[in-house]
């Protein structure tokens, strides 16, 4: 199960990077087709040096810094919202996992 999940995660990551690469290539193609550099056309993903030697990433025009990510993480920790569907899904998955494990052990014990 872990191997399957790892393969799926790897596949999703490769597909996401492929989409970003494709958008970058489309941008380059549009610039080549136009024949001149248009500053209004931006790349899908850019890295620049910001203030105080911080790296800034821009994904689809949205600037993201490490400081922004830390602030968002702290904000999410403060909010601590209750998500009913998340708790219900976790309970359901635990039930299915425990049932499958007990059936596996029962079948294994019958064969011994």
From Swiss-Prot:
InterPro entries: Uncharacterised_YqxA (IPR020534). This is Uncharacterized protein YqxA. The lineage of its organism: Bacteria, Bacillati, Bacillota, Bacilli, Bacillales. It comes from Bacillus subtilis (strain 168). It comes from the Bacteria. Pfam families: DUF3679.
């Amino acid at each position: 199960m872990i191997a399957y999940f790892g393969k799926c995660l790897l596949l999703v990551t490769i597909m996401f990077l492929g989409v970003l690469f494709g958008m970058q290539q489309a941008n380059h193609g549009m610039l080549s087709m136009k024949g001149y550099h248009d500053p209004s056309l931006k790349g899908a993903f850019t890295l620049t040096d910001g203030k105080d030697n911080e790296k800034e990433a821009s994904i689809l025009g949205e600037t993201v810094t490490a400081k922004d990510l830390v602030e968002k993480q702290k904000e999410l920790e403060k909010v601590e919202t209750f998500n009913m569907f998340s708790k219900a899904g976790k309970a359901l998955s635990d039930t299915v996992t425990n049932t499958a494990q007990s059936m596996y052990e029962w079948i294994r014990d019958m064969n011994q």
